């Protein structure tokens, strides 16, 4: 983890001299005026998507957009890009997954139908999706999951953004688990954005999102659970081109593994550590 922190800290130091110039540019130039994208260096610590704690440093492509009836957020990661991580970490150079992807496209029902479906605090309604794909290095290390359902934006009356989505889940590949190729459970997602203040020539904001998963048949298997929670809390400092983030993420039954379960994957007994906190440091360039 020292290497993780040092690597991201070094990247922060190297880019700090450029942020002032970016902040002075009143009209920054991007490749698109609606497709907002960046390349990030991410250092992760004690993530709990499996029963073993994982640390990594990797490259990420991230994008978000909102245009007419289309609303989008997504990212593509290259695990262990720099060949730095702990003993549990596997990635593109070490017989692990060369690519991990998550996308969240939403399609406005209001705009596609031409009908105003708003009422009360519910501003707009969407056909909402959340698709996750882990390429893995073989079938046993691959995941493909599609959540689909209904989403909405909420008018809170405050200077903040709030959206809610509820999905049913179709599980294709899932690292060889017993719930593959079937409808299996549900997800409720809440996302919010709160601008805080101007700071050091940039914009400081708080972003949060939480996934509540429940109703999975995987809980019928030994050492697995039918539910899980992943809750992320992000403090972000944004400039025209550079951005920096500190992320705290809480996992409950991460990866639907029962916390404290006694496991053996062929290299000795260990206890699952699927509940607790992890974190990320991020530095990125918007283009």
From Swiss-Prot:
Signal peptide as annotated in the record: 1-22
Compartments, as annotated in UniProt: Cell outer membrane
SUPFAM superfamilies per record: Tsx-like channel
First-listed, main subcellular location of the protein, grouped into a coarse class: membrane
Keywords: Cell outer membrane, Ion transport, Membrane, Porin, Signal, Transmembrane, Transmembrane beta strand, Transport
GO molecular function, a single term: nucleoside transmembrane transporter activity
Keyword Repeat applies: no
InterPro entries reported in the protein's UniProt record: Channel_Tsx, Channel_Tsx-like, Channel_Tsx-like_sf
A cellular component annotation (GO) from this entry: pore complex
The keyword Membrane is annotated on this UniProt entry: yes
Gene3D superfamilies named among the record's database cross-references: Nucleoside-specific channel-forming protein, Tsx-like
Membrane topology: Multi-pass membrane protein
Family annotation (Pfam families): Channel_Tsx (PF03502)
Record GO biological process: monoatomic ion transport
Annotated family: Belongs to the nucleoside-specific channel-forming outer membrane porin (Tsx) (TC 1.B.10) family.
Record's function text: Functions as a substrate-specific channel for nucleosides and deoxynucleosides. Also functions in albicidin uptake and as receptor for colicin K.
Database matches in NCBIfam families: PRK15106.1
Protein name: Nucleoside-specific channel-forming protein Tsx
